[in-house]
Structures are given as C-alpha cells and as structure tokens.
C-alpha cells in the first residue's frame, strides 16, 4: 500500500512540475502591444509590438505630427525596428513612417507593404494627391529604402522571434471604390494561443473579399477596429472575428461623433460600430482617445 501511495505522489509531483514549467514558459513568451495615442487632433493609427527578445515590430505609426512620439519609443528601445508593416499609404497611417525613415539614428531592417504604383492611386483617389505625393516622394528620394521593402504574398507567414504574422489581405487593384482604404494589408499576429487582427482601413468591398477568401482564418481574440471604428469593415466580418478585445484607433471627437463640440453632431458611424460590439458582448476596449495603452499579452 505504501508503495502505491508513493508512486501516486511521484506521479502527481511530475504532473505539477510539468504544468508549472509550461506555465513559466508561457509567461516568458509574452509580448507587449502598444497602441499609441494621437499627439495631434487628427485621427491616426500606430501600434508597436515588443517581442520576447525585445525585437520591435511596428504597424503603421500615425501622422507626420505623431512621428516624434514614435521616434522616442524606437530610440528608447534600442533604435532598431525589426519589421515595419504599412497597411496603406494614407497620411494618418504612413505619415510618421515618412518622417522616421529619414532619421539616421534609427535602423529599419525590413519594411512590409503591398502597394500599387503611383499612377493607380492618382487615377482612383486623386483627392488624396498630397498623401500620394508625400509617400512616393519618400520612396523616390531614399533609394536605399527600396532594398528593405518586402512585398508579402497572400497567406504568407512571417516569423519574428516569438510571434507569427499571417498575411490575410494584400492590395486589391480590382477594387476602385474607396480605393486606398480597401487596399489595406490585413495582418493576423499570433503569440502563443492569442491572436490579434489588424484591419487597417478595410472597407465594405474588401470586407466581402476577406469573408469570401479568409472566412475560416478571421476569428481572433483581439481586433483593431477598421477605419478608426466607423464606416470601415462590415458587421458581418466582425461577427466572424468575434473578438474578446477591441483596439480603437479613435480620437475623442470621432468616438463621440462630435463635429462642432456637441456629441452626435457629426456624420460618422462610430456609435453604430460600438453597438455592433455591444451585441457581440465585447467587454474590453482600448481607445486611442484615452491615450497610449501598453498591453501585456501572454
């Protein structure tokens, strides 16, 4: 009887040791996800991921006016960007990138973007000519950048330290309605068993394409709300994602639909998107209007 008890205790001890080790390993594989707050009155989007071994991965970065806070973040973390993903070329996403690429104190190893040639943008969204000119001027005037640019392929998986970035969406040249937003690159980041979906400014048409081609891959624990939380991705897409946490790159005026100092005085659809998330019973929200948020993800 004593031998049986002894064996049982040994087995229990081994199980506890294995479970404890697995827990420690998992805890040591966390990442820090930073959602940057705006430093101007404009809407913007910028995220940083700090991996287990302190590699820095960026998604967009905000406007040119937001560049200083991102520069400070990069330099305080060693001055090296392992990978920079640009979802699309609008200035509220790529403006900070345009400034920081000219900083000799910052090294960028790889730049991931899925873009058309300049003429396509001018033909399909001439109203954003200034954004288009600014972005392509940076590429044309810094030829060394072109050696760092990688154009990812659909369904490609990019391993960076303890995270894996899956490319669910790339440029959509056939979609010419809301052309630049609908050309947003869509990323799904996995760390351990947690997933984060970055939609950029995905619109209705690109939502439909994502649902058709990537429906089984869209479910994610965390989602970045498309087009700053309004007039972006469809409710159907969010239902498929079924997130537990929402990341809102949304300033206060847009959150409140406030165009003149009065809530609900604007034309924006943020309140509608908020209702969608209530119906999905999402309990946790990180909102740009509340300032920079640093999130630890296991």
Segments from the language model and where they lie:
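N-terminal Sec-pathway targeting helices
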Residues: 1-15
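Core dinuclear metal-dependent hydrolase active-site scaffold
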Residues: 18-79, 143-217, 294-298
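Extracytoplasmic/periplasmic, Sec-exported soluble proteins
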Residues: 41, 62, 66, 89-92, ...
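Active-site environment of divalent metal-dependent phosphoester hydrolases
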Residues: 43, 64-66, 89-95, 118-121, ...
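Active-site metal-binding motif and surrounding structural segment of the metallo-beta-lactamase
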Residues: 52-57, 65-117, 213-230, 242-247
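Cap/insert and terminal regions of metallo-dependent hydrolase folds
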Residues: 83, 110-113, 207-291
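Binuclear metal-ion centers of metallo-dependent hydrolases, dominated by the metallo-beta-lactamase
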Residues: 110, 118-181, 252-298
């Amino acid at each position: 009887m004593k031998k049986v008890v002894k064996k049982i205790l040994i087995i229990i001890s081994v199980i506890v040791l294995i479970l404890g080790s697995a827990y420690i390993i998992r805890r040591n594989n966390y990442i820090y996800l930073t959602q940057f707050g705006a430093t101007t009155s404009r809407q913007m989007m910028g995220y940083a991921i700090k991996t287990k071994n302190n590699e820095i991965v960026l998604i967009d970065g905000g406007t040119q006016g937001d560049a200083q806070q991102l520069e400070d973040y990069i330099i305080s973390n060693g001055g090296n960007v392992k990978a920079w993903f640009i979802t699309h070329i609008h200035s509220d996403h790529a403006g900070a990138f345009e400034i920081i690429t000219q900083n000799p104190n910052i090294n960028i190893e790889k730049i991931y973007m899925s873009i058309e040639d300049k003429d396509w943008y001018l033909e399909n969204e001439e109203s954003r000519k200034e954004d288009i000119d600014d972005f392509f001027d940076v590429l044309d005037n810094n030829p060394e950048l072109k050696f760092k640019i990688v154009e990812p392929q659909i369904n490609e998986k990019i391993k960076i330290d303890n995270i894996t970035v899956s490319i669910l969406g790339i440029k959509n040249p056939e979609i010419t309605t809301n052309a630049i937003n609908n050309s947003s690159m869509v990323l799904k980041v996995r760390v351990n068993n947690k997933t984060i979906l970055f939609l950029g400014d995905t619109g209705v048409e690109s939502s439909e394409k994502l649902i058709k081609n990537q429906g089984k891959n869209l479910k994610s624990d965390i989602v970045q709300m498309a087009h700053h939380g309004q007039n972006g991705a469809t409710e159907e897409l969010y239902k498929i994602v079924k997130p537990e946490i929402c990341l809102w790159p949304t300033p206060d005026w847009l959150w409140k639909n406030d165009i003149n100092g009065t809530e609900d005085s604007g034309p924006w659809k943020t309140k509608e998107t908020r209702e969608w998330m209530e119906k999905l019973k999402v309990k946790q929200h990180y909102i740009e209007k509340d300032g920079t948020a640093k999130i630890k993800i296991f």
